[in-house]
Structure formats: structure tokens, C-alpha cells
């Protein structure tokens, strides 16, 4: 793998180590990803939550992505945060230097990067994932830190692809990937497509929600471009990204793609489709977005409040549905009893 590509995944590991060792520093400005300007990072973030770095770098390995990757982050445009304030330049410099020192002193970071690639290669080859193989081929003498290394590697994969790595056999220590959201999209795709396209869908849903529940097409592609996914370029895994976004996911009713009313020349926008509303929730998507920003959902106050309202409405709908089901069951029971009595 090219050195520049590996450095992008390591950048996040630097920040992880720096945060662990420098909790007293508060918010510091994370270095912008290699090959990326500060202005482009700010453009992608828009109004970001309080005390968050302007860029959180996550690399999708080139062997699986087929295109350079920089910042894999959703732009919260409508979800403004309260009391936003940027760290001063001295804090930025101090934070960056501490991060660099932390990276040099943290040998586990290299293991994390290697394990990410190992796990994704296992997925690509459809080979079983076992604890024994992870220790034998990657972790080796650092097996005492297995849990920490696996946790950090799993977080990278979760943010890149929207999946969790879970132990499915605690006796033989077998692991498998599972979709992070309750999406049945996995069931409609081949094993080869399952993980990457689910991640693409999750990010699209996040962009839409964070842009006021309807995202201009250009805003969605801006984020996708940063991931190395372009509307007019064939992608190693996604194939034709424009077709995936504007046709495949639309036909599956996960997304809606429509012309902006009264736009001249015509402009288009994305919305959540009915299947997305049915199979996931705003809170789950917000939790995913918050994790990408290394924060909590409440760091986006307006979106958090909207997600809470959505959760309450869903809970009320479930209660009403159960009550309706119970009433129907009682009615059928009474009808059956009445018919039986008349028969006698």
C-alpha cells in the first residue's frame, strides 16, 4: 500500500493516542488530512459541534476502495451546535506536536492499521475471521493488547463501511461483519456488495438528515468525492456510483431522488425513502454521524432534539400498533366464542 495512503489511517490513530494522553488539553485542532486544505475541511463540516477537530481522517484501504481517500465526514449544515469556539493557534500547534509524539510512542497504532487491512482482506476473499489468525498474522507478540487493537480496528471499519465486527462463536473465537443499522439492504445484495454499499447508504442518510432532511445532490456528492467516490467515475467496489445513488437505492426505496421544485436550470435533491424510515431512525443515523466526529449525538443540539422527537413518535406508534393488535385479537376471540355458543 502506498505510504501516503497508510498515513491517512494513521492520522486518526495519532489523534486517538493524543486524546488518551492529553485529556487536559480540551479541544485541539486536528491536522488536516494529507493533500487537503483547511478550507476544504471546513467546507465539509459546515457548522460543527462544539470542541471538535476540523477534520477527522479515516482511510478506506486502497486495495478495497480503488481511489484516494481523505476525510470521511458528514457535513452538519442544519444541525448547528451551541457555543462554538475554535481553539487558538497555540493550542493547535501544541495539539499537533503532542499527537505526533503520541504516534511515535504508540506501537499499537501500527498494529491497528495492519489489522484493518487484514480484516478487510479476509472479507474480500470471503475467508473466516478468527482470533487465532489475527494474533498469528498481525498482532503476534502484542497479543496481550488484542482486545484494544481489535476494538480500535473495528471502529475504523465501522466508520468506513457502517458495519460492526462481532464475535459469533465465543468458543472457537470466530468473527463476522454485521450491518450497523437495521437495514434489510444486505439481503438484497450479493456478499461482494454488502458491506461497502451499506456504508455508502448510511453516509447518504446521514448527509440528508444533517442537511435538514433534504440534501442537494451537489452536497451529497461533495462528501462522496472526499471518500474517493465520484459520480462520473467507475468505482472498484461500487461500480457506477451515480447509478447506485440515483437508481439502485431509489428502486429499493431507501432514497428518494427528485427535482428541486421550481429550479431552473433543474437541480436535484436526495431524501430518505420510505424503507429507510421503516428500517432505521434519525437517532441511529445521528449516533453514527456523531461517532464519525468522535463525539456524542447531543453535540448537535437541533438534530438531537429532532431525533428525540422522532424516537418519541416511533414509541407512540408502537404502543398504538400493539393496542390495535390486542383489540383485534380480543374481537376475534369474542366472535369465535359467540359462534361456538350459537353452534351449541
From Swiss-Prot:
UniProt biased composition (Low complexity): 324-334
GO terms, biological process: negative regulation of transcription by RNA polymerase II
Annotated TM spans: none
PROSITE patterns hit by this protein: MAGE
Top-level taxonomic group: Eukaryota
Domain MAGE span(s) in chain numbering: 108-307
Annotated spans, Disordered: 1-50, 66-103, 324-344
UniProt entry tagged with the keyword Cell cycle: no
Main location (coarse class): cytoplasm
This protein's GO CC annotations: cytoplasm; nucleus
Keywords: Cytoplasm, Tumor antigen, Ubl conjugation pathway
Residue stretches of biased makeup (Basic and acidic residues): 89-101
Biased composition (Basic residues): 1-17
Subcellular location: Cytoplasm
InterPro entries per the UniProt record, alphabetical: MAGE, MAGE_N, MAGE_WH1, MAGE_WH2, MHD_dom
Polar residues bias: start-end ranges: 67-88, 335-344
Function in brief: May enhance ubiquitin ligase activity of RING-type zinc finger-containing E3 ubiquitin-protein ligases. Proposed to act through recruitment and/or stabilization of the Ubl-conjugating enzyme (E2) at the E3:substrate complex.
Oligomeric and partner information: Interacts with LNX1.
Protein name in UniProt: Melanoma-associated antigen B18
